[in-house]
Amino acid sequence: MWLQLLLLLLAPQGGHGCHGLELDRELVLAKVRALFLDALGPPPVTGEGGDPGVRRLHRRHAVGGFMRRGSEPEDQDVSQAILFPAAGASCGDEPDAGEAEEGLFTYVFQPSQHTRSRQVTSAQLWFHTGLDRQETAAANSSEPLLGLLVLTSGGPMPVPMSLGQAPPRWAVLHLATSAFPLLTHPVLALLLRCPLCSCSTRPEATPFLVAHTRAKPPSGGERARRSTPPLPWPWSPAALRLLQRPPEEPAAHADCHRAALNISFQELGWDRWIVHPPSFIFYYCHGGCGLSPPQDLPLPVPGVPPTPVQPLSLVPGAQPCCAALPGTMRPLHVRTTSDGGYSFKYEMVPNLLTQHCACI
């Protein structure tokens, strides 16, 4: 009696078995809800509708800062990055009046790893000139108003660009395609020449760089691997028998095994409470504990009675049950918010994911 009670206490709560052949999804979800509420407590309620706020955490936990939606094709994986200068020209730090009259402005940009790892499709530099349209037209009639250089190890080099439409007192410099590789460097130092422009320290006049990127196409080797047709099935008597075998009966998967179910927190109604991960694979034990012999045992010999195979049982005389082996459960780490996304908390749900199942 005491041994049976000890077994029940040691059996993990997340790996309950002894279910029939068909396990209802709602039953699994109800069990998962109970496990989460037991570990984390009830979700916070701050609004009338029971939601902890409307601010959501952007799904940017992938490498590079962005996560692509699984339903979007690869050619639709586009993004836009706005870069502000890490160090710009300061009107109070200019060495002499000659440089100020020359109208040379230096801006240093630091593209992120995400931007450098992608293919740039367009790039524009927005610069506040402080000139109205008439002054801009008069300056362009005599000589180019703006010039763009990049600082390299060999000295300043011109950057091919063209002027586009811009709001009043602003200029938009569209970088040519040949200049897109500049955004793949960790540091980008641009020299902008504008003799008629005045230096401004106002925050709203800060220049910025806009880059549109998309995922790089696969390399030649990877493309070749994707386009290579699969090898034909090698013919053999065993392969022929495998192809000609009848379909398996549902009872073939009725034995004790580890089952999996993809559960999203939106389905549980907790997507505004548990913000990461958005979903997880829930493993649990399922199936019966019949007396079918293992596949590695020898076939029965005619005239010799077969030896009955008993499942593993920790309690003699007890009915075996498909359950997780004690001590083999793994936790799930989640990120939660109680104020709508203004602060986050890392929490853990222990003994949730089943690793090994057995009839015990």
UniProtKB/Swiss-Prot annotation:
Positions of glycan attachment: N140, N262
GO CC, alphabetical: extracellular space; inhibin A complex; inhibin-betaglycan-ActRII complex
MF terms in GO: cytokine activity; growth factor activity; hormone activity
Signal peptide bounds: 1-17
PTM annotation: Proteolytic processing yields a number of bioactive forms, consisting either solely of the mature alpha chain, of the most N-terminal propeptide linked through a disulfide bond to the mature alpha chain, or of the entire proprotein.
Superkingdom classification of source: Eukaryota
Site (Cleavage): R60, H61, R226, S227
Cross-referenced InterPro entries: Cystine-knot_cytokine, Inhibin_asu, TGF-b_C, TGF-beta-rel, TGFb_CS
Principal location class: secreted
Record propeptide residues: 18-60, 61-226
SS bond list: C256-C322, C285-C357, C289-C359
Protein's GO biological process: hemoglobin biosynthetic process; regulation of cell cycle; regulation of cell population proliferation
Record key words, sorted: Cleavage on pair of basic residues, Disulfide bond, Glycoprotein, Growth factor, Hormone, Secreted, Signal
Pfam families membership: TGF_beta
Localization (cell): Secreted
Role of this protein: Inhibins and activins inhibit and activate, respectively, the secretion of follitropin by the pituitary gland. Inhibins/activins are involved in regulating a number of diverse functions such as hypothalamic and pituitary hormone secretion, gonadal hormone secretion, germ cell development and maturation, erythroid differentiation, insulin secretion, nerve cell survival, embryonic axial development or bone growth, depending on their subunit composition. Inhibins appear to oppose the functions of activins. Inhibin A is a dimer of alpha/INHA and beta-A/INHBA that functions as a feedback regulator in the hypothalamic-pituitary-gonadal (HPG) axis. Inhibits the secretion of FSH from the anterior pituitary gland by acting on pituitary gonadotrope cells. Antagonizes activin A by binding to the proteoglycan, betaglycan, and forming a stable complex with and, thereby, sequestering type II activin receptors while excluding type I receptor.
Record-stated family: Belongs to the TGF-beta family.
Subunit relationships: Dimeric, linked by one or more disulfide bonds. Activin B is a dimer of alpha and beta-B. Inhibin A is a dimer of alpha and beta-A. Inhibin B is a dimer of alpha and beta-B. Interacts with TGFBR3L; this interaction regulates female fertility.
Name recorded for this polypeptide: Inhibin alpha chain
Lineage: Eukaryota, Metazoa, Chordata, Craniata, Vertebrata
Gene (name only): INHA
